[in-house]
């Protein structure tokens, strides 16, 4: 049996699988259409030496010790407990997720229409009633005064040198070869024993059953010659403007602190067709039709290909869930295909 593996996509799903297989003797070729590794977790130091996440904030949190220990092989950590504020019409800030203090400020009867409806409808391009409750319930409404966004997760931290540095170490292995700026072609499959593919599954099958709906994001990066604007990293908007939230990067403690400048990123949701076909989020609708279409594509999967990640599996996953899922996929493959 050949021990050559192709991994399509250099994000978390692909990198975890590549590392685990390479450590068991497989020769792994990794390709990515972008010009960088780390997928949507890619970060970089901008002109003011502030650490910016190119594709929006990636905040690591989990209760899964095995995930934390696996990633800890490739990074040191800086403790960080995420806090979020929402800006009201009068410019004042209140805590999210909604807690007792926030409910007292705006009135309990206005919580849904102030915080949940405008953000969710902009994010998903659907009316609130059309969005799956699973998505809506990701942001709870609390009956206490807790201000932590992830109050129940044991491990909450940021990679000390950033995510890109973490990926560089994870992919630094003699049997992993990475080629960037390289698009997947089906003809490549013939050279490999197996392919782990993180591309959109409907695109792989040339949309033969119809396109799967995805949402995208446009990121507007801004540098300002002032020390700081907000007391927290993330501020959500409650108005009907185009943006869902703004992130002030120096409020994440693994970023260098420039006393003269601050850097912000505004997020504007849109259809992926309006953003160079950049897909970020599978759309989980209340009717379940999108899931049914994905399963029809999934049924076409051939034994030499495994679809991975958010786009390949058409599922909304946090980082720790992507890592856990990818570890399980790699372990299953290694058990069934020992060298």
What are these regions (language model features)?
Residues 3, 25, 174, 191-193, ...:
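Short, well-ordered alpha-helix to beta-strand connector turns
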Residues 3-30:
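N-terminal Rossmann-like FAD-binding beta1-loop-alpha1 element of flavoenzymes
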Residues 14-15, 37-40, 316:
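Short N-terminal binding/cap micro-motifs at the start of the first secondary-structure element
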Residues 19, 23, 43, 172, ...:
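Short, well-ordered alpha-helices that flank and scaffold nucleotide-derived cofactor binding pockets
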Residues 22-47:
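Glycine-rich FAD pyrophosphate-binding loop
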Residues 48-110:
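Dinucleotide-binding Rossmann-like beta1-alpha1 core, especially the glycine-rich loop
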């Amino acid at each position: 049996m050949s021990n050559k593996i192709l991994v399509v996509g250099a994000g978390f799903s692909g990198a975890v699988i590549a590392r685990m297989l390479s450590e068991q003797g497989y020769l792994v070729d990794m390709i990515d259409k972008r010009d960088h590794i780390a997928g949507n977790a890619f970060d970089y130091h901008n002109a003011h030496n502030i650490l910016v996440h190119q594709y929006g904030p990636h905040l690591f949190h989990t209760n899964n010790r095995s995930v934390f220990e696996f990633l800890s092989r490739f990074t040191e950590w800086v403790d960080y407990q995420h806090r979020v504020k929402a800006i009201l019409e009068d410019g004042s800030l209140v805590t999210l997720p909604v807690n007792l203090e926030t409910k007292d400020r705006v009135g309990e009867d206005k919580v849904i229409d102030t915080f949940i409806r405008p953000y969710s409808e902009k994010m998903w391009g659907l009316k609130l009633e059309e969005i799956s409750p699973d998505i809506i319930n990701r942001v709870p409404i609390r009956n206490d005064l807790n201000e932590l966004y992830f109050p129940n997760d044991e491990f909450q931290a940021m990679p000390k040198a950033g995510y890109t540095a973490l990926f560089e170490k994870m992919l630094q292995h003699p049997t992993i070869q990475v080629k960037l700026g390289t698009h997947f072609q089906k003809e490549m499959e013939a050279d490999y024993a197996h392919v782990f593919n993180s591309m959109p599954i409907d695109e792989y099958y040339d949309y033969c059953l119809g396109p799967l709906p995805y949402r995208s994001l446009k990121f507007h990066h801004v540098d300002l010659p002032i020390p700081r604007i907000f007391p927290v990293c993330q501020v959500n908007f409650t108005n009907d403007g185009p943006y869902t939230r703004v992130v002030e990067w120096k409020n994440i403690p693994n970023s260098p602190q420039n006393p003269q400048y601050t850097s912000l990123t505004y997020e504007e949701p849109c259809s992926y067709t309006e953003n160079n076909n950049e897909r970020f989020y599978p759309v989980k609708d209340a009717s379940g039709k999108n899931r049914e279409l994905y399963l029809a594509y999934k049924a076409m999967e051939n034994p030499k290909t495994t679809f991975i990640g958010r786009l390949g599996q058409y599922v909304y996953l946090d980082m720790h869930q992507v890592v856990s899922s990818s570890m399980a996929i790699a372990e299953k493959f290694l058990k069934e295909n020992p060298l």
